[in-house]
């Protein structure tokens, strides 16, 4: 799945401690996307780095805007991801 787009998505709001990362991982895996999701140290943001076909990446972004039931998403920022890392699946990172 080397073709497609790579983006970095920052989701802000009540998105930590509400199952947001698991929600994103589950949907990204179902969509066949690669990358990762992690909490950011500010306590109110989650970073998603995702790679795959544009239509599937856009579907994940739509899902991120909604989030799981306990989440309250205030904003979603999307930018191109310029990293060189090759992803072999979609994971939750704890760094």
Curated annotation (Swiss-Prot):
SUPFAM superfamilies: Acylphosphatase/BLUF domain-like. It catalyses: an acyl phosphate + H2O = a carboxylate + phosphate + H(+). Keywords: Hydrolase. GO terms for molecular function: acylphosphatase activity. The keyword Hydrolase applies. Residues 6-94 form the Acylphosphatase-like domain. The active site is at 21, 39. Its EC number is 3.6.1.7. PROSITE patterns: ACYLPHOSPHATASE_1 (PS00150), ACYLPHOSPHATASE_3 (PS51160). InterPro entries: Acylphosphatase, Acylphosphatase-like_dom, Acylphosphatase-like_dom_sf, Acylphosphatase_CS. It is an enzyme of class 3 (hydrolase). Pfam families: Acylphosphatase (PF00708). Belongs to the acylphosphatase family. This is Acylphosphatase. The lineage of its organism: Archaea, Thermoproteota, Thermoprotei, Thermoproteales, Thermoproteaceae.
